[in-house]
Amino acid sequence: MKVRQLFLLSIMLLAACTTAPTATPQPETESTSTPEATETEAAIAATEESVPTPRPTLGPDEWMTLPVVPEVTDTAREIYARGQELGRDPKHFSKVGDCQTNTGFYLVDFDNEDAYGLGEYAYLQDTIDYYEGSFSRTSLAMRDGYNVAAILTPLRADPKQCEKNENPIACEFRLHNPSIAIISLETNFSDRPADDYGKYMRQIIEYSIEQGVVPILATKGDNLEGDHSINAEIAEIAVEYDIPLWNLWAALQPLPNQGHSTELNDGFHLSFSRNFFDKPKNMLSGWPWRNLTALQALDSVRRGLQEQ
């Protein structure tokens, strides 16, 4: 039985961004290391704290029509208010994710005024200024090779910065003390159903809520599983917990090749241009839209949370 448990856990933790081809336009070298077979600590159990009453479920493919930029609900305001009582920093947000998050392409440029141009989206500058420092921060809850289970597993945490038995998301929340977490986990375990993805994602969401951190949950741009089941699960979770959903998938659909690289043509890696939103040619690529809509989602949530 013990050998079987070790084998199953090892399989669950192996898959993340390695499901895509190893060629990548990203400047960083993605990790090729995998969890040791000796990993025995399971992902943390779902919090025993009460959670919001489930909302009505979405209809088939209804998630595809949900807006790209979310609106803030009373539930999100309640989470934020609890976080303020706990001492969460209103000017900090954290990134939670895998290799598509752990890259210099994602949000980092907004901490460098020469690296982006807002154009018609100049109203977003207030949000860039408000969260200065969080855009380029290397979160302890993002890393190449992470998936929904790894985020919850102490053995995947940075041993130099995290405490013993502390998982990556708990470590990040302790060290950065955010009031908001943008959660974008693109990949699932190999050949496992979306229900398994949802089981772990719910633990991440419930832990964030318990800690007074407002989760912004993102759909993914790809459909590697073939039936959009993971995005459907992500949207269902957002509706269930009444939390903000950033529908990245919808933003990418009008773009050439749905915003994915035509050179790699793997349906996973986004096409790249720099974040100058006033240059029409740049806005034909996926990465500027990922960064723009992430910033728009953050801006909408910030403004909504601050409304009295």
Q: Each PLM stretch: what is its role?
A:
Residues M1-F7:
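Bacterial N-terminal signal peptides that target proteins for export
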Residues L9-M12, A16-P67, E71:
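Ser/Thr-rich, Proline-interspersed low-complexity disordered segments
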Residues V51-N102:
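N-terminal module-boundary/linker segments of secreted carbohydrate-active enzymes
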Residues G83-D196:
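Conserved SGNH/GDSL esterase-like catalytic core that processes O-acyl groups on lipids
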Residues D89-H92, H176-I182, I209-I216, Y241-P244:
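Loop/turn elements at helix/coil->beta-strand transitions in domains of secreted/extracellular proteins
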Residues V96-C99, I183-N188, A218-D222, N247-L252:
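Active-site-proximal beta-strand/loop segments in catalytic clefts of secreted hydrolases
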Residues I182, N188-F189, R202-I234:
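Active-site segments of SGNH/GDSL-like serine hydrolases
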Residues D222-Q308:
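Catalytic His-Asp segment of secreted/periplasmic serine-dependent ester chemistry enzymes
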